[in-house]
């Protein structure tokens, strides 16, 4: 299997893209992406943590290989996505895992990053994303890392909003998919390949004052509105909103050959590493939600380029 595959462009991405497009309205509202990484579990030493909350919202349409909303099976079992993943990774074993969607208002370019990892025995089904990110950044769990195909498709014809990526690493040239996107998708390994969203809009739009509790939804009149505490914080025409679909699938040849991780095993590995480094710490009673513990791991295993796997 090739672990750093060359991205494959898929066109057309969907037989009926209009059906996918209408799902965004039907499945609203969507929560702010910031709710996936609450402020108290961000690395406060990073400049990124000091930025206001961007108008970036997310929803889950499929999880654990099962659709969560009507119509998600059209994406989860998309034959073109499956065939591209087989070709890119050189395997016949592709198991769709989840479908997530991103809804973005006008905003600055996001920080270059890689996506949130998964491990055998530790996935987003049972583990919070900040904990999975620090597992990935530590390099201590590579033997258990799930190799995944990532396929992104977009619904946006406005200004900016590019998908920028570095298939040869950050020292190599940047490539971009640009608006108007049309019925296309890109299959790659976004858990390993650095990428970002470019500036959405013309760069002069005023950012709404929102927190992680904000939501976005259509207003029934052709616009999308951001709501928080019962107040409308921003209103956008539909054409100003960038919609994208993220499909993930495990790819492998046969049995991965490793026992699945347990939380006890993960903690054994983390604590042994901290002792080896000579770092004082207290073992938390609930390591998945203990903020000081996760912040300690973030500081020890900080990656100055990666802002937290937002795609």
What role is predicted for each listed range?
Residues 9-10, 32-35, 93-102, 162-165, ...:
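A structural signal for short, well-ordered beta-strand segments and their strand-loop junctions
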Residues 37-54, 119-137, 200-233:
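Charged, glycine/proline-rich intrinsically disordered loops and linkers
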Residues 114-184:
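Glycine- and acidic-residue-rich phosphate-binding/metal-coordinating active-site segment common to enzymes
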Residues 53-128, 132-144:
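Signature of the catalytic double-stranded beta-helix
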Residues 5-7, 96-98, 146-152, 160, ...:
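Extracellular structured ligand-interaction cores
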Residues 1, 90-93, 141-145, 155, ...:
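A general structural signal for short secondary-structure junctions and capping/turn motifs
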Residues 1-62:
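Generic N-terminal leader segments that precede the first folded domain
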Residues 158-311:
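Catalytic core of Fe(II)/2-oxoglutarate
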